[in-house]
Amino acid sequence: MTAIFKREFRSFFHGMLGYVLTAFLVASSGLYFLARCLIYGLTDFSYYTLYQTIFMLLLYIPVLAMRSLAEERHSRTDQLLLTSPVSVWGIVLGKFFAMAAVFALPCAVDAVMIFILWALGGTVSALLANLAGLFCYFLLGCAAIALCEFLSGLTENQIIAAVAGFSALLLAYLMPSLRSMFNAGSAVALAVFTGIAGAASLAAGLRTRSFVLGCLTFAALCLGLTGLFLLRSAWLTEAFSAVLSALCLFTPFEDFVNNSFSIPAVVYYLTVTAVFLFFTAQDMEKRRWN
């Protein structure tokens, strides 16, 4: 894993990509830091800088992660990785930690800005609140990196990987607004869960190469959903609402912006990161044996 990490991290700075991405995020934070915090004397860095520039991650993260696995598949070097002594988890984690380290560079500059505010007369409580906000911002970025790394492994085209990552993050960014549009009741919930059941059944059928198993899985899931819709429709609606809430990737960060250290937000981001790293490892494991 260490060799993969070093190789990936160095590759970002052999060309211009690492420098451009770091400069892009630092410039975004720097402009808001200057315009809001220094000129107006506002000490809430988490809100006036990080929260105001969080949409920049929609561009930064997909471009950062687009080449992680897609380039390997395009150049066919993924076959060398999959047949090397390094485990699948070593490959996935090595690439993930390399991208997280690149993302940590602009975050380190943000930390310097926070200490500048403190040196100019900020309180210790404001310093701790801003550092907590930066910590959650980093966890948010790591969760987005894990998601985009997974999407990068599904294609060998870097542009498609970047567009898919941007689309997924944009959907998560807009989900708090979109969630109110889907509160139409249990019928909508049934339709959405049926679609999810179909996708899960298709994945099960493809993974096992069994059409019969896929059909039986879909039939069983549909039967269960129909029974739940007829007998306990409120449960279906509540579950649907919980699913939509789980898709709001950027919402937990607001707890830190409001100067409240939220353990559930930390657990949420760590869980999202672990889930998508697991999906990536499973996809690579499948290709290794195929």
Language-model segments: what does each one mean?
Residues Y19, W89, Q158-I159, P264:
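Residues that define the loop-to-transmembrane-helix transition and helix capping
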Residues Q158-F256:
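Transmembrane helix segments
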Residues F13, P85, T123, L154-T155, ...:
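Helix-loop interface residues and adjacent transmembrane-helix termini in multi-pass membrane transporters
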Residues A3-S11, S87-G90, E254-D255:
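Cytosolic juxtamembrane amphipathic/interface segments immediately preceding
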Residues S29-R36, Y40-M56, A98-G165, Y173-A184:
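Secretory targeting signals
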Residues S68-A100:
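Helix-loop-helix units of permease transmembrane domains in multi-pass membrane transporters
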Residues I4, C142-E149, G195-S201:
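Hydrophobic, membrane-inserted alpha-helices
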Residues M1-E71, F96, V112, A203-L213, ...:
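Hydrophobic alpha-helical transmembrane segments
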